[in-house]
């Protein structure tokens, strides 16, 4: 799949603010320091489309990005419609709030949990949640429960092992095998990635192209 352009659409702090674009959507979820921003920037060939916060875990919004919009195609936010038919390769990438790092107040944590649930249950065109995990870390029961939560909502989950350049090839293979056993996951749905080396990019984009 060729990426022509990518643009920020909107940041939402509650479900009422979620944009209705009408094209396939792919979300990214993981710990606050798992490298979501770097991965999305790598996928769309932009250095700073997704801002990396100076304090990991402080992003509390659901951020939406539109990919491959032709210059001739305009979106009217009032009517929530495009000026013409959307091309087949146009889609939305969604950056979901990270978890497990920032010290948020109990109320704010509950608000994010509620927003995540509302997102997952109100996006009929959501095709895949890419679940990011640092390849240097051991998987946790919390991550297993999170994947089970998404599966319980009939959402396809693909695990992306990030920061693969920080470990050797053998360790990458071992981690992938261990994760497949721990999560009872098909290895084809575990992608090894490195934003720094741009590895895994083609695998992720190929999967997106198949699901659009």
From Swiss-Prot:
Mg(2+) binds at residues 37, 59. The keyword Cell cycle applies. Residues 22-212 form the EngB-type G domain. It holds the Pfam family MMR_HSR1. Transmembrane segments: none annotated. Its cofactor is Mg(2+). Keywords: Cell cycle, Cell division, GTP-binding, Magnesium, Metal-binding, Nucleotide-binding, Septation. GTP binds at residues 30-37, 57-61, 95-98, 162-165, 192-195. It comes from the Bacteria. InterPro entries: G_ENGB_dom, GTP-bd, GTP-bd_ribosome_bio_YsxC, P-loop_NTPase. Belongs to the TRAFAC class TrmE-Era-EngA-EngB-Septin-like GTPase superfamily. EngB GTPase family. HAMAP family: GTPase_EngB (MF_00321). Necessary for normal cell division and for the maintenance of normal septation. This is Probable GTP-binding protein EngB. It comes from Treponema denticola (strain ATCC 35405 / DSM 14222 / CIP 103919 / JCM 8153 / KCTC 15104). The gene is engB.
């Amino acid at each position: 799949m060729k990426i022509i352009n990518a643009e920020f659409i909107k940041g939402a702090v509650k479900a009422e603010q979620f944009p209705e674009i009408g094209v396939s959507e792919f979300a990214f979820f993981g710990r606050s320091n798992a490298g979501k921003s770097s991965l999305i920037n790598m996928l769309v060939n932009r250095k700073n489309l997704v801002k990396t916060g100076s304090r990991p875990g402080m992003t509390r919004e659901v951020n939406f990005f539109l990919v491959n919009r032709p210059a001739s195609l305009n979106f009217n936010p009032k009517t929530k419609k495009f000026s013409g038919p959307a091309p087949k390769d146009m889609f939305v990438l969604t950056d979901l709030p990270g978890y497990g790092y920032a010290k948020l107040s109990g109320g704010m944590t509950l608000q994010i949990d509620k927003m995540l649930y509302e997102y997952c249950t109100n996006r009929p065109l959501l095709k895949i949640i890419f679940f990011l995990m640092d390849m240097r870390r051991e998987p946790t029961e919390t991550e297993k429960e999170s994947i089970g939560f998404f599966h319980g909502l009939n959402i396809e989950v693909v695990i992306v092992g990030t920061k693969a350049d920080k470990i050797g090839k053998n360790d990458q293979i071992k981690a992938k095998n261990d994760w497949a056993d721990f999560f009872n996951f098909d290895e084809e749905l575990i992608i090894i990635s490195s934003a720094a080396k741009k590895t895994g990019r083609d695998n992720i984009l190929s999967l997106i192209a198949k699901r659009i």
